[in-house]
């Protein structure tokens, strides 16, 4: 029964010191940026009923959920997604729209062993509810660009795609569910050879505009030239409108001065099936890992109540932390300036001194050792140059100068003066 007591479950890990501090800083800066832009916070439980995620099309694979039972035998899951619980909250209550909400929390997905993915990650995100025009998508992209700028993330890009265009192609070519799932992997992975073979095996007419658009789809990434290519092959009004929405987004964001942070990828298809229109993915060049994901999901909230249009995105906090660790100077833990050693009956004075020193910008630390020599040893080990001893009715200040020497004592001590 104790075989695994020293190990972590697959896909999880411990976070220590530097990473904990950075995770907290990233979450807080994201939160403040989103609050400044008018978003309001929502928090949902870490555990949800399985039924919350078990609606039509099953946007999240059942095998990826951590499932267990509550006291009444009902199936409970650790939330594998943040957007669906938010949709539950919005759909089951009456709201004045539009709504702009923000959140932060852990999500849990059981990825395959050795996949290199963590099963527990931290996400912070935003959602714009009740608006079906392109202003909502633009608001989300601008918000996340500004947030990443404040975090001083270097060399990032937000890719803009359009899942509606892909769905129009699939529908027009009558590609069924199983085939569609295979096709999706070819396009997302930009596997040109496999896609060409798929078209050949399906005996699709390569002269047909829609087939030509399908075959080109993985190659349609870059700037506005991509839009021009897609427009030439769009064979229905629905396709043209889907492409026009991406064009309008790109031009508006570029006009605002954020053009260097965005690009277009019409071959991008989100793995979550609830997206219905424009989608986003963000990357950092040096890492290659996804740091932002999201899009429009106009049909999701209707699973829980009133049908409301919505768009949102999530920032992968763990990946941001990884990027900051690689891009910035090595992190140094908060350096202790002074250790205060005290006799137990002088704790009140020691605590008061610590507070006074902190007000002066000094990081003062109360010693946990009862023996002064142990305090000296701790200070040397941690490169702390000053020890103050609170003893009887007076204070003694020691500094390290090849050995511990008395710097000031009694009434002459600067720290004694602060206490008076």
Swiss-Prot record:
GO terms for molecular function: catalytic activity, acting on a protein; histidine-tRNA ligase activity; transferase activity. InterPro entries: aa-tRNA-synth_II, aa-tRNA-synth_II/BPL/LPL, HisRS-like_core, HisRS/HisZ, HisZ. SUPFAM superfamilies: Class II aaRS and biotin synthetases. GO terms for biological process: histidyl-tRNA aminoacylation; L-histidine biosynthetic process. Keywords: Amino-acid biosynthesis, Cytoplasm, Histidine biosynthesis. It is found in: Cytoplasm. Pathway: Amino-acid biosynthesis; L-histidine biosynthesis; L-histidine from 5-phospho-alpha-D-ribose 1-diphosphate: step 1/9. GO terms for cellular component: cytoplasm. This function is generally fulfilled by the C-terminal part of HisG, which is missing in some bacteria such as this one. Required for the first step of histidine biosynthesis. May allow the feedback regulation of ATP phosphoribosyltransferase activity by histidine. Belongs to the class-II aminoacyl-tRNA synthetase family. HisZ subfamily. Heteromultimer composed of HisG and HisZ subunits. This is ATP phosphoribosyltransferase regulatory subunit. It comes from Bacillus cereus (strain B4264).
